[in-house]
Structures are given as C-alpha cells and as structure tokens.
A protein has these predicted regions:
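Membrane-proximal intracellular helices of multi-pass ion channels
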Residues: 1-144
Length: 144
C-alpha cells in the first residue's frame, strides 16, 4: 500500500474542492447577507488542509493500483464531507446546528440523497442554500 500517493491525491482533490467555496462567497456578496467570512474561512481551511496533505508528497511520481484507488475513493468521501461541514458550522445564521447535523447535511448533498436536517429553509441565507445545492451538483458529477 502506497500511502504517499493516497495522501497526495486526497490533498490535491481537497485543494480543488476549496474552490467550491468561491461561488457561494460571490452569492453572499451580491445579496449582502454577511456570511462571507464563513466561506472565506472554509476556503482557507480546506485549501490549507489539502496543501498539508499534498506538500510532503508533491515529488512522488508513483502510479496507484486498484488498492490505492479504492482507498482514495473511500477516504475522499469522508474527508470531503468533513471539510464540507465547515460553512454550516462557521455560519452565524444557523446557530443551533451540531457537528453531526452539519456532517449529515454535507454527506447528504455529496451523495445526492436530498435529505436535510435544516428547518425553515426560507430563513436560511441564499448563499448557504446555494452551497447546499452546489454540494448536490458536485455529488451528482462524482457519481457520473
């Protein structure tokens, strides 16, 4: 098992996923909802997490086999869902959301389940709603 190639790949994918925070950030700035810091912090933490995983192994030039490929897919679903919780946890507009509920919301979006634990969706900022829908779109792209 070549853990170095797994860490390098997950780090690279996390850095790419960090850019998923940019469209909701722009939506927040357009509607002036005041939630932009949650997306800035999420972008920064996700990009930094990816960089920490990728940097030590950036020179590794090995190809991964089936075993590493399966581990990358499994780890990526979990890691991506964990980092996907950040905007839900950092936002001020959804103050009563626990970590498990935020993780459920993120995993539900990325697996295109469509289930939600958020109540009163009409009161949730448009940027958070856009982020939820974007997670579902990204999950759909991952399934295709």
């Amino acid at each position: 098992m070549q853990i170095s190639i797994v860490a390098k790949t997950i780090g690279l994918l996390l850095m790419v996923f960090s850019f998923a925070q940019v469209p909701p950030l722009i939506i927040d700035l357009i509607y002036a909802e005041g939630e932009y810091l949650s997306f800035v912090y999420s972008f920064s933490l996700t990009a930094l997490g990816g960089l920490v995983l990728w940097w030590p192994f950036k020179e590794v030039k090995k190809d991964f086999r089936l075993r590493e490929g399966v581990l990358i897919v499994v780890c990526f679903w979990i890691v991506l869902s964990l980092f996907g919780t950040l905007p839900f946890l950092i936002t001020d507009s959804i103050s009563d959301l626990s970590f498990s509920e935020a993780f459920f919301e993120s995993m539900s979006g990325l697996t295109t389940t469509g289930a939600t634990v958020l109540s009163q969706l009409d009161e949730v900022p448009k940027s958070i709603l856009f982020y939820r829908q974007q997670l579902q779109w990204l999950g759909g792209m991952g399934i295709i």
